[in-house]
Amino acid sequence: MPRFAANLSMMFQEVGFLDRFDAAARAGFKAVEFLFPYEHPPETIAERLEKNRLTLALFNTVPGDWAGGERGLAAQPGRDQEFRDGVDKAILYAKASKCRLLHTMAGLWPAGRDKEAGERIYIDNLRWAADRMAAAGLTAVIEPINTRDIPGYFLNYTGEAMRIIERVGRPNLKLQFDLYHVQIMEGDLATKVRTLAGHYPHVQIAGNPGRHEPDVGEIHYPYLFDLFDEIGYQGWIGCEYRPKGDTLAGLGWAKTYGIG
């Protein structure tokens, strides 16, 4: 049976961030994920997880100036030291919270700029990050993101991601498989679930269009959940969606799985 992680950056907006751990646990979730924990000390995050017996499945390394529009540093020229400092900070949080996966965001890449130059930066930084994380027993993941939600994002397709992973050549660099983004950019989700099996330690879901609950829109998730079971997927499935209304009221899709 699939295992679901509540995304606390999007779900349970009815309460403040630190109270969302309690809310997720009360709803029946056994794990959580979120974008960034850095507004709170690592000890505070760890305490909330332990109190609610929650696993932290995934979070992102420091993305640069998120409020100012930046969306990662790994493929950004002249930002190597800032990127590395951010990775080290993320590792501290991961150790405190016993999280094993860190998403390393590439950032934006202006149209017309030589993308091969960005790819060289990206590969060098990912090698450094993967080695740093390996020393801490962690796995790095990269995620193709659709061009509608984040125009100009450096990495958009699973094929691109797999080519980058191959070029980096580190066993602890894997694919973050977000079905919402892949549906928008590529489709053919069931085939990709099978062909990419073994390369993704983390999956994320949302309905399309709208990025709401997974039972809203064109994607038939029950079929895909059964397919994950069929191929023996053991990782978490992150619920990275924006509830259309009250979070709990929108969990009808999850009752089959003991949530809501």
Predicted regions and their residues:
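Conserved beta-strand positions in the central sheet of alpha/beta enzyme cores
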Residues: E33, A57-N60, H103, V141, ...
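Short secondary-structure transition/capping segments
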Residues: E43-E47, G69-G72, D114-A117, Y153-L155, ...
